[in-house]
Amino acid sequence: MTNHSVILCILDGWGNNKNSQFNAIAQADTPYWDSIISQYPQSNIVTHGPDVGLPDRQIGNSEVGHISLGSGRIVLQDLCRINEEIKNIRKNTHLLEFTEQIKRNNGICHIAGLLSDGGIHSSLSHMLDIIDALSYLKIQVVIHIFLDGRDTPPISALKYINILCSHIKDLNNVSIATISGRYYSMDRDNRLDRTTKAYNSIAFGDGKRYEEPISAVQDNYNAGITDEFIIPCVIGNYQGMNPTDGFIMTNFRSDRVIQILKMITEDQNTNHITLKNTIGMIKYSNELNIPCLFPNKKISNTLGEIISNQQLHQLRIAETEKYAHVTFFFNGGREEVFENEERIIIPSPSVTTYDLVPEMSAYEITDTLIKKINLQKYSLIIINYANADMVGHTGNIEATKKAITTLDQCLGKILKCIHNTNYILVITADHGNAEEMFDVQNNMPYTAHTLNPVPFVVCNYPKKIKLKNGRLSDVAPTILEILNIKQPEEMTGISLIDTSN
């Protein structure tokens, strides 16, 4: 081992794009970043498709990105894994046990999930396959649609609703019950007023009522409300849940289903309806004691575990929006804290959308980081700056430019702090976003992640090095080489430090 310590700085949503048009990063005022890329070794990292365990051309996301960064290997992601396993869904023992209980209770099945082909939180085909299986098993099904508009174009819901309606039109035991924008049904930032609106529509049939789903979406469009923000509403004569019913969540990503599922499964008050017979696609969290259709596989010997096994101290810092990513996901889906691992969560601003406060909590994260650096205690510090991603998702390029300038100032403060210390600053991202802000083909803001590579930069290294291009799973092995810690065989990534010369 050496005396080096490493700060892994994850600029969430910061991609490389040679085209400066509609590129918030290229257009922002970034003197410190310009200095960094002019004087420190750098390379490009791939964040999508098979390089991160996803299908070809499937864009990456924060969950996949942090799993890849922390595990140091290509992990077959839930999307790909479930794509294979769902082919035998009618024989899935977990589904059969779930439906047997519904039959015994003479109940119906509620299916909820993000109706999207974005591939980040869900797959439309998964929902359709499960609907078919339940119909085959002669279970009455009602569907609660969560609309996207974030990992898909902002006004694209009618496309997916038409696909769903066409699929179920000949299924007499299947109907659409509610519609909600993901802003309400998939909040992860403890804004429970949003989650409650979605819950009330599902549990009690509360909300504006429409005869059919197309008119519900069109009515919101006419009011200037796009997919993500569509207010929870009710379709047809849907009256709500009964305690004898069952509930399936078809999202395969955990962070944005926990709040709504806790409301559905846990007693809140005397007027609250809960469904004990609830099942998810994967094990979402230890907080949720519900079974799953496709159990996860354990990931061992992650970067965090290796640092802990070396009896070294490590620190994770992020604001609320990305806290799970630098902890749970970075540790390979492990919620328990490793020995000598510390975690600090900085509250995200309480605003409707982050273009209203593009600085988010970046300055607070930086101030906290600098205090911790000065302790000279930690061998590894992992921080996540959410700005480029979360502000980029709003599609507001001017606000995103302000977010990028904020990050630039934070990087300048970090570099000044680590000067003449043993800290080496490793800068990268989990995926792109802010570097591509407009969809020219569809003539609308582009709010999703991108297929662009992300930067990989090593700052303050004591000797001159060159870096190779690679993938996200190569970051952990590179950090281990810097720390002079042996890479375990489970890590199949390679160090990006070029030793060919």
From Swiss-Prot:
InterPro entries for the chain: Alkaline_phosphatase_core_sf, BPG-indep_PGM_N, Metalloenzyme, PGAM_B_sf, Pgm_bpd_ind
Binding positions (Mn(2+) 2): 12, 62, 430-431
Active site per database record: 62 (phosphoserine intermediate)
Gene Ontology process terms (BP): glucose catabolic process; glycolytic process
Cysteine pairings via disulfide bonds: none
Reactions this protein catalyses: (2R)-2-phosphoglycerate = (2R)-3-phosphoglycerate
Keyword Protein biosynthesis: no
Cofactor: Mn(2+)
PANTHER family: 2,3-BISPHOSPHOGLYCERATE-INDEPENDENT PHOSPHOGLYCERATE MUTASE (PTHR31637:SF0)
Family membership noted in the UniProt record: Belongs to the BPG-independent phosphoglycerate mutase family.
Protein name: 2,3-bisphosphoglycerate-independent phosphoglycerate mutase
Organism, scientific name: Ehrlichia ruminantium (strain Gardel)
